[in-house]
Amino acid sequence: MSPHPGDRVRVERADVTNEGILMPSSTSDHLVIKLDGGYNVGIDRADASIDLVTSDAYDIGGTQTDIGSSAGAGADTEADKTESDITSKSAASAVAFDESLPTVSLISTGGTIASTVDYRTGAVTAQFDAEDVLRAVPDLAGRANYRGRVVRNILSENMTPAVWQDLAAAVADEIRAGADGVVVMHGTDTMQYSASALSYMLDTPVPVVFTGSQRSADRPSSDNVMNAVCAVEAATADISGVFVCMHASTADDTCALHRGTRVRKNHTSRRDAFKTVGATPIGKIEYDTETVSFHRDHAARESTELNLTSELNEDVMLLTFTPGMNIDRQTAFLTDSTPDGLIIAGTGLGHVHTEFIPTVAELVADGVVVAMTSQCIEGRVCDRVYDTGRDLLEAGVVEAGDTLPGTAKVKLMWALANHPDPTNAMRKSLAGELQHRSVPWE
């Protein structure tokens, strides 16, 4: 009898032996084995010896499929589908509703934390109701009542302003429907941009908490469970606004709660990649004790009424100045395209090559809002110290203080579409992005 998915098997090929759980494969030419360490390994079936160790050692769900089948071949992908494209399950869930618990809406946009492998097809599924969530993260049970919703199922590098608008509308819908908090599951690469966007689009009376995962669920070092649990705890806390909740350190003990407009992904792969820039995090969540504490002033729950202002002007560019930049080429491009807004990430206190200043003056004269940020991680722009800075101010550049460059771009997109004076808006803090005082750097 041939082994089936879920059986424990021993596979020998080319003098290498692997033992683990047989998983369904998307092709008939390869075996997929989940090793005891949690990782999956693919093995070419040619010349492989397969021995059954234990039957039904692992419940993977779905219909059993013989190892020779190709159930996943040609399966449709859920990537890039919109909310209306995705077939949802019944709103009714087998998960009992507990009136003593708060209600948290879990919204998925894709990314590592929200990805679930459908082993019957080999595809990533976008099904995302309360049962799916609790099946993936059992530790969430008993903390809240959950509603699941998919806005997109995309890699975060494919995020667009249009998706931000759909996401903001979905969050607003969930709050109107009675959610006590919202958790947005999002890929980590562009999470800071999406959190910034919703910070401007939404006045929210409840916490809206972005979270994600640096390591996928099949890896022993995955951070998905702790991040999801801590995000739910933050979403039920006495606070309002838009935040990011991720590992505070490499240990599995605490998550940091960052303001959506002050957070930055500072490492490509570490679990504690996200940091609040220029300040301490808003708060922290202790994983073991489920304690949420706050380090800084924050708006209390229900301290504002829900308001959605989601219009964006996408004609905003972010230009990072570098030595050797072809100024003639940049000038020709900018003056020909004439964006509505330009964010410059300048050097140091906010500088560019002096030969680029006339280009800035020309853009401002044409009605372009030009704001200056710094490439430096810490500190703030001050163009009143050196001649170059003073010349930039005379040319019409707006100092954006210590606003992060990416946040500044999103802010200007929103301000151009919604604020009566976008230039002046860049000088003010609209969503906690601009601090009046930079804390000492350690």
UniProtKB/Swiss-Prot annotation:
Asparaginase/glutaminase domain sequence ranges: 102-429
GO molecular function: asparaginase activity; ATP binding; glutaminyl-tRNA synthase (glutamine-hydrolyzing) activity
UniProt KW Protein biosynthesis keyword: yes
InterPro entries per record: AsnA_fam (IPR006033), Asp/glu_Ase-like_sf (IPR036152), Asparaginase/glutaminase-like (IPR006034), Asparaginase/glutaminase_AS1 (IPR020827), Asparaginase/glutaminase_AS2 (IPR027475), Asparaginase_C (IPR040919), GatD (IPR011878), GatD_N (IPR040918)
Residues annotated as transmembrane: none
Broad EC category: ligase
Record: active site: T112, T188, D189, K265
Alphabetic keyword roster: ATP-binding, Ligase, Nucleotide-binding, Protein biosynthesis
EC numbers on record: 6.3.5.-
Keyword Nucleotide-binding attributed: yes
Reaction(s) catalysed (UniProt annotation): L-glutamyl-tRNA(Gln) + L-glutamine + ATP + H2O = L-glutaminyl-tRNA(Gln) + L-glutamate + ADP + phosphate + H(+)
GO biological process, one term: amino acid metabolic process
SUPFAM superfamilies: GatD N-terminal domain-like, Glutaminase/Asparaginase
Region (Disordered): 63-84
Taxonomic superkingdom: Archaea
Family named by the database record: Belongs to the asparaginase 1 family. GatD subfamily.
Main function: Allows the formation of correctly charged Gln-tRNA(Gln) through the transamidation of misacylated Glu-tRNA(Gln) in organisms which lack glutaminyl-tRNA synthetase. The reaction takes place in the presence of glutamine and ATP through an activated gamma-phospho-Glu-tRNA(Gln). The GatDE system is specific for glutamate and does not act on aspartate.
Complex and partners: Heterodimer of GatD and GatE.
Full protein name: Glutamyl-tRNA(Gln) amidotransferase subunit D
Native organism: Haloquadratum walsbyi (strain DSM 16790 / HBSQ001)
Gene assigned in the entry: gatD
